[in-house]
Regions:
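C-terminal functional extensions of proteins
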Residues: 215-287
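A short, acidic, amphipathic alpha-helical segment used as a generic capping/interface helix at domain edges
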Residues: 35-39, 84-88, 188-200, 216
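A mid-sequence, solvent-exposed acidic-amphipathic segment
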Residues: 165, 170-207
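Conserved beta-strand scaffold positions in the cores of enzyme catalytic domains, especially
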Residues: 52, 146, 174-179, 231
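Electropositive, gly/pro-rich neighborhoods at or near active sites that engage anionic ligands
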Residues: 1-170
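Glycine-rich beta-strand-to-loop/alpha-helix junction loops that act as flexible
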Residues: 210-213
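Short active-site oxyanion
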Residues: 142-144, 205-208
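Residue-level detector of flexible, active-site-proximal loop/helix-junction positions
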Residues: 107, 182-184, 238
Length: 287
């Protein structure tokens, strides 16, 4: 069982990594979480436009042009080789956000320092836990939108038509849904920015939760051009809202994956490490 220091009330962490059993990994985990929550409230209340970049292990491989996992050409981020894109746009863009979060695994922190010349402001686990315990939804009700892969945003929109799911999240609705391609969004950064920017100009949300894959390295810092909002990268938390999260991801151990019994809605969806045989599931019926 992970230490009390690393608990986020209202969530369960199934991740067995030793870092969660060592108080020295991140001694101020609880104090910094309160600071993080206070900062978000302050930024939203003041209608400030700020960006939060969540670093994960895949970002290291993408930023160093290594064909590993999601960073491999033809897999998810790119349909073509690194030599065929302006990779420097992503490397430079990754340095230009306002705040940075990183999972507390020692390897991730070490690799972060190799590719991003900024300090880590907060553990990325906060973005998981505060979705898992619904704090973000309740705190920013009426002000919150989503940015993510088109396939997953479509699922979420359909789920949110059900009152039962609204009650589960503690949120009547998301104010805005902004879509980007699930695959190969890094092939043409400017085209992806244009697609997202045109949507953002029509939004009213004061805070966006985002999960956009590796294109974020070049894109996140550009979003402030289109609307004044807090852009919070929560990574795979978007998968949780879409009802397809791997419950062994940090702090989603008690999450219920709500789904709709309509197979076409899930065609072509990138399920990442999601396993439908593990965790709690609930199938919603259409009214």
């Amino acid at each position: 069982m992970y230490l009390e220091n690393y608990k986020i009330e209202g969530s369960i962490n199934n991740d067995t990594d030793p870092c969660f059993h060592d108080v020295n990994t991140y001694p101020l985990f609880q104090e910094k979480m309160e600071e993080f929550k206070k900062l978000l409230i302050e930024l939203v209340d003041n209608n400030e436009s700020k960006t939060f970049y969540k670093y994960g292990d895949g970002d290291y491989f993408f930023l160093t042009k290594q064909s590993v996992g999601s960073a491999a050409p033809g897999k998810r981020a790119l349909s073509k080789g690194y030599i065929n894109i302006n990779h420097e746009q992503f490397v430079e863009g990754a340095q230009l956000c306002d705040y940075y979060t990183c999972e507390i695994y020692p390897t991730n922190k070490d690799r972060f320092e190799q590719v991003i010349d900024r300090k880590i402001d907060f553990p990325a686990e906060y973005g998981y836990g505060l979705v898992a315990n619904k704090w973000l939804f309740k705190q920013f009700s009426g002000k919150i939108g989503l940015i993510g892969a088109d396939t997953k945003i479509n699922i979420i929109e359909n789920l949110m038509e059900a009152e039962q799911y609204q009650e589960y999240l503690g949120l009547e609705k998301f104010e805005d849904y902004v879509r980007l391609p699930q695959q190969f969004a890094c092939d043409d950064l400017d085209a992806t920015e244009k697609m997202v920017g045109e949507q953002l100009q029509k939004t009213s949300s004061k805070i966006f939760l985002m999960g956009m894959g590796h294109v974020k390295s070049g894109l996140i810092h550009r979003l402030k051009k289109y609307t004044d909002a807090v852009f919070l990268d929560v990574g795979s938390s978007i998968d949780a809202i879409a009802g397809i999260i791997d419950v062994n991801r940090p702090f989603f151990g008690d999450w219920t994956n709500y789904q709709i019994n309509e197979p076409p809605l899930y065609e072509g969806v990138d399920f990442l490490q999601y396993d439908s045989s593990i965790g709690k599931h609930l199938v919603l019926e259409r009214n």
